[in-house]
């Protein structure tokens, strides 16, 4: 799958996959702190 691109820097993969994860975690904690997460 990654044969044409060669080596992909891990920091690029970490950034691309980390930003959405941090966003979802941030939304989750914001919802729990504001009281919205308690209804889940």
UniProtKB/Swiss-Prot annotation:
It is a single-pass membrane protein. The chain crosses the membrane at residues 8-28. One of its GO terms (biological process) is photosynthesis. SUPFAM superfamilies: Photosystem II reaction center protein J, PsbJ. Keywords: Chloroplast, Membrane, Photosynthesis, Photosystem II, Plastid, Reaction center, Thylakoid, Transmembrane, Transmembrane helix. Gene3D superfamilies: 6.10.250.2070. Its main location: plastid. GO terms for cellular component: chloroplast thylakoid membrane; photosystem II; photosystem II reaction center. It holds the Pfam family PsbJ. Belongs to the PsbJ family. NCBIfam families: PRK02565.1 (NF002722). PSII is composed of 1 copy each of membrane proteins PsbA, PsbB, PsbC, PsbD, PsbE, PsbF, PsbH, PsbI, PsbJ, PsbK, PsbL, PsbM, PsbT, PsbX, PsbY, PsbZ, Psb30/Ycf12, at least 3 peripheral proteins of the oxygen-evolving complex and a large number of cofactors. It forms dimeric complexes. One of the components of the core complex of photosystem II (PSII). PSII is a light-driven water:plastoquinone oxidoreductase that uses light energy to abstract electrons from H(2)O, generating O(2) and a proton gradient subsequently used for ATP formation. It consists of a core antenna complex that captures photons, and an electron transfer chain that converts photonic excitation into a charge separation. This is Photosystem II reaction center protein J. It comes from Populus trichocarpa. The gene is psbJ.
């Amino acid at each position: 799958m990654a044969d044409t691109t060669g080596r992909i820097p891990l920091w690029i993969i970490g950034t691309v996959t980390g930003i959405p994860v941090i966003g979802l975690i941030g939304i989750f904690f914001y919802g729990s702190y504001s009281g919205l997460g308690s209804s889940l």
